[in-house]
């Protein structure tokens, strides 16, 4: 892995709405990760405009080699409160396109974008999200197909030019790959499971 910043962005708005404990777990979890030397800096975002502005401007003399996003997700999407981000951010007409491009230009050639969110890489839309983001940024994209908590299941990675190796129905408890309705909760014996205390993606995931 090349030199560069390791950053976490989390949804700080969760502290002000139920379940508040989840919001505080994200906030104080970043302190633990910093103390363990896993990340260099964390930012609590109120929306993706602020998040991307931080990613585009923080310590601009250094590249970024890893971004973890801690927040809510759905199939092919991530959220800060009600502000959603999906693969449409890659279109020049998107309101966050310029900020995203500025962030993208800071990524190292072997950068990792890890979405520690529920379901984001699940179903067909999650696979399409991972593929589009990897191809556009040149980064390795990682995320989950299950609802995550302490256990975080269905963790998969995709590199530029690759096709997803996991089933588009993985993690689904109701619906189809094209029209998902509900996902399973993560468990210790579900596929590709880590915990929230793990800071590294195992080989083969």
Enumerate the language-model features and the residues they cover.
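Non-Sec secretion/translocation targeting segments of pathogen effectors
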Residues: 1, 67, 203-205
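A domain-level signal for caspase-like cysteine endopeptidase catalytic cores
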Residues: 1-54
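Hydrophobic, Leu/Ile/Phe/Ala-enriched alpha-helical segments that form helix-helix packing faces
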Residues: 28-36, 55-59, 103-104, 133, ...
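Solvent-exposed, well-ordered amphipathic alpha-helical segments
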Residues: 30-38, 63-66, 112-114
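Short amphipathic alpha-helices and their capping/turn segments at secondary-structure boundaries
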Residues: 50-65
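Catalytic cores of nucleophile-dependent amide-cleaving enzymes
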Residues: 66-70, 75-153
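Active-site-proximal C-terminal subdomain of hydrolase catalytic domains
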Residues: 113-205
């Amino acid at each position: 892995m090349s030199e560069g910043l390791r950053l976490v962005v989390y949804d700080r708005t969760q502290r002000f709405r139920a379940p508040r404990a989840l919001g505080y777990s994200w906030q104080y979890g970043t302190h633990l990760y910093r103390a363990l030397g896993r990340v260099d800096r964390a930012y609590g975002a109120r929306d993706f405009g602020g998040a991307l502005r931080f990613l585009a401007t923080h310590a601009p003399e250094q590249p970024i080699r890893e971004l973890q996003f801690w927040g809510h997700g759905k199939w092919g999407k991530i959220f800060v409160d009600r502000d959603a981000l999906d693969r449409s951010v890659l279109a020049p007409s998107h309101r966050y396109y310029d900020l995203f491009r500025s962030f993208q230009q800071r990524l190292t050639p072997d950068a990792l974008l890890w979405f520690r969110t529920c379901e984001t890489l699940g179903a067909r839309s999650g696979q399409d999200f991972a593929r589009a983001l990897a191809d556009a940024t040149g980064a390795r994209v990682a995320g989950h197909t299950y609802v995550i908590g302490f256990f975080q299941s269905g963790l998969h990675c995709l590199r530029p030019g690759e096709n997803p190796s996991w089933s588009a129905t993985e993690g689904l408890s109701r619906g189809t790959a094209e029209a998902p309705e509900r996902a399973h909760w993560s468990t210790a014996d579900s596929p590709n499971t880590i915990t929230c205390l793990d800071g590294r993606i195992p080989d083969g995931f």
